[in-house]
C-alpha cells in the first residue's frame, strides 16, 4: 500500500469517527477530546525527551488523567482549569533547572486543548454547531493554504522553521476560512453583520500561528514529524496543532462573554 493510500484511509477513518462523535456529543466527545490531549502529551514528552525527567513524565501523566476525570464528571470549568494550572505551576517550579518550561508547557498545551474542545461541544445543540463552525474554519484554512501556496508561491511566511509555507497560502487560507465560517453560519440562520467573518478570520490566523508554533517546537528538537501515531500523517500534533489553537481562542471568547461551562452559548444559541 502506497503512502498516499495510507494517508487517504487514515483520513477517512479519522474524519468519520470525528464527525460521528461530534454529532453524538456528551461523554463520547469528551472522551475523544481527552484522547487527543493524551496523545498530544505523549508526543510532546517524546519530542522534548531531553528536557523531561522521570518525575515530570509521571506527574504530567497523572495530573492530565485526573484533569480528564474532572471533565468527565463535569465538576465545573473553573475548577478543572484551576486544577490544570496548579499542576503546571508545580512542574514549572520543580522542573525548571532540568526542563525549563517544557514539561509545564506540554501539560498545559495538552490539558487546555482537551478542555477547550470538550466544553465547546458540551451537550447543547448549539455546541454541535460551534464545533462544526470551528472545523469548517480550520479545515478551510489548511486546505486553501496548501493549494493556494503551491499554485501562487511567493514570499515565505516563516522560512526559518516552516520553509514550505507562503504568504499567499496564509492569505488564501484566511479568505477560505471566512467563506467556510459564513457558510456554516448561514446554514443555521445566524444573524448577519460583521461578527461571524471577523471571528472566522481571527480563528484562521490563530490556527496558522498554532501550526507555525508546532513547527518551531519540532525544529528545537530536530524532528521532522511530531510522532508516528497516525499512519501516513505523522503525529497527532501535526494534525491538530492549528485546530487546538483555534479551539482555545474560541473557548476563551465564549468563557469571557458567555460562561465558562457553556462557552458555545454566545455563538449559535439562537
From Swiss-Prot:
A GO BP annotation: CDP-diacylglycerol biosynthetic process
Location within or outside the cell: Cell inner membrane
EC code(s) of this entry: 2.7.7.41
EC class (word): transferase
UniProt GO cellular component terms: plasma membrane
InterPro entries reported for this sequence: PC_trans
Keywords per UniProt: Cell inner membrane, Cell membrane, Lipid biosynthesis, Lipid metabolism, Membrane, Nucleotidyltransferase, Phospholipid biosynthesis, Phospholipid metabolism, Transferase, Transmembrane, Transmembrane helix
Family: Belongs to the CDS family.
Listed name of the protein: Phosphatidate cytidylyltransferase
Organism per entry: Brucella melitensis biotype 1 (strain ATCC 23456 / CCUG 17765 / NCTC 10094 / 16M)
